[in-house]
Amino acid sequence: MKLKTFFVLLLALIAIQRVNAQAKSYILHTVAFYNFENLFDTINDSNIDEEWLPDGAQNWTSKKYNQKLENLARVLSEIGTGSIQDKKNPNSPTLIGGAEIENRGVLEDLVKQPKLASSDYGIVHFDSPDKRGIDVALLYQKKHFKVTSAINIPLIIYKKQMDASAKKKNEADDASDDKSEVELNSERVYTRDQLLVTGFLDGEEINVIVNHWPSRSGGEKKSSPFREAAGALNRKIIDSLVKINPNAKVITMGDLNDGSYNRSVKVALGAKLKKTELKESGDIYNPFEQMAKDGNASLFYRDAGDIFDQIMISQQFTLPDYNSFRYWKAGIYNMPYMIQTVGQYKGYPLRHSINEVGFSDHFPVYIYLIKQIN
């Protein structure tokens, strides 16, 4: 009889523990990155925008511009959920990194779109010296994220870096050397700055770096030193943040114009495939490396799918407890309406053409951050 009573009590205790486990609640925030692909207005200004004017090569009219804004807003509004338990209540991302942005004005037009207006986004944007006249930026929901500092950090690179790389193309690749030849008196290549924003996400300090690394113009191998320099600058920024605060939480995201396997990411930045490889606070985990290995793609480069758009996180986001914001999972947002369905580019992102205003030649990427609240 006593034994029977013991088993009844044991089963009751197990049931209570299960109920408590099921009752756990979490705060969830989505962090996204989207290359908007040529988000230009129709106003002729001092920037390099002649192609994107009503009488330009793209015949970029106000009607097309407004349709582009509507398309982007639709995508952004659908990424993310209000909570893990309530996936039927979508909420646009708390933080959005963006690239290929002409100026602050186009961002102001974007966040005013009906599908985004209720999220009340703030904007962090600086003009960069990029030769195409495009910048990076961060959009943030004001009710959740409070900016404390923002700075644009220039990437100083020179044409001689590319030339030196071409001369060495037949030499053995030394993975321990992530430096390129630089001649300071050679011609500077003007590209996008790296944007560093620090703020409090629901009271918890995080640092966000938004990137758009140099393109593969001139060839992947020949231009690689430029992106390796971008990766090294990213590494320097992260190291400086961790030096100030050993427990710093860092998110670095952007269109890197390289895959997770390239030297710029693996060597210069030092991103890791597995969370178990993270040994120090400044070590970086790249969840998109495994996704690429699994055959996923955020774009197609020379007819091959790849993930150039990546969001990476520092070790502090990967700790096993959920008493503060931790990384949960990552994804690529590629709904059917965003995909080309016919023709030579079937399966590719549905981008802009002369006859159709699409979305972008990239799919947006995102991660979820979660924190236990009971």
Show where each model-derived region lies.
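Structured beta-strand-rich core segments of catalytic domains in phosphoester-bond hydrolases
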Residues: 101-205, 213
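Bacterial Sec-dependent N-terminal signal peptides
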Residues: 1-26
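Active-site environment of divalent metal-dependent phosphoester hydrolases
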Residues: 103-105, 131, 216-218, 257-263, ...
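Metal-dependent phosphoester-hydrolase catalytic domains
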Residues: 21-22, 228, 240-250, 258-374
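Active-site-proximal beta-strand elements of phosphoester/diester hydrolases
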Residues: 30-38, 149-150, 205-215
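Active-site His/acidic residue clusters
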Residues: 47-50, 57, 204-226
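N-terminal, active-site-proximal structural segment of metallo-dependent hydrolase catalytic domains
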Residues: 21-113, 120, 124-138, 173-175, ...
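Active-site metal-binding loops of divalent metal-dependent hydrolases
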Residues: 36, 101, 213, 255-256
